Amino acid sequence: MGPFLPAICVVLLALNAAVSPASVGPEDYPAADEAERTANNDIIFDDYRGKGCVDDSGFVYKLGERFFPGHSNCPCVCTEDGPVCDQPECPKIHPKCTKVEHNGCCPECKEVKNFCEYRGKTYKILEEFKPSPCEWCRCEPNNEVHCVVADCAVPECVNPVYEPEQCCPICKNGPNCFAGTTIIPAGIEVKVDDCTICRCHSGDWWKPAQCLRRECLNGQATS
């Protein structure tokens, strides 16, 4: 058995030498090295400067060609210096516009508010309404509400009352005034007691009544 050992050792040494890392250099795998360098670098696009233009989607346009870039609805022209795009002065959108479309180069109002809002309710253009007994309102064409508040006349009595659905106070018993603590009707003389006769001032209901007190004896007027 002894004479065969040296031959086995020689075979093992030969195999180790064949797979030694030190024996493999970069020049042995040029294709793999190039692939690795390409993977580590960013993808390089063709340079179209002075030759054409590229939009956001990667489409190439020739010099002088008109196109619409992805980020804008305004047309552009491809030049040697790059895209030159139209930038028109767009008209202002109406402040009452409720629907705006951006399909064209300029935004366009497609629907204008055609009603008025007042105290949580909506009204048609030119519609008249009364939000309260004392107000008369109308929805104007400019979508604004114009109201007029009733200008009530001064009541000619000291005890006016407010009726439901009526704006201004009324004197249910007609004009009157105070004679002391007593309310007397206007226009006539009123005997407030056995010795006193009172009369309201004509048209001046807020003034105390004019009273004439006669001479009395034991609470009875003397003639």
Swiss-Prot record:
InterPro entries: VWC2/VWC2L, VWF_dom. Keywords: Developmental protein, Repeat, Secreted, Signal, Synapse. Residues 1-21 form the signal peptide. Residues 51-110, 114-172 form the VWFC domain. GO terms for cellular component: AMPA glutamate receptor complex; extracellular space; synapse. Pfam families: VWC2L_1st, VWC2L_2nd, VWC2L_C. It is found in: Secreted; Synapse. GO terms for biological process: negative regulation of BMP signaling pathway; nervous system development. The keyword Calcium does not apply. May play a role in bone differentiation and matrix mineralization. May play a role in neural development. This is von Willebrand factor C domain-containing protein 2-like. It comes from Danio rerio.
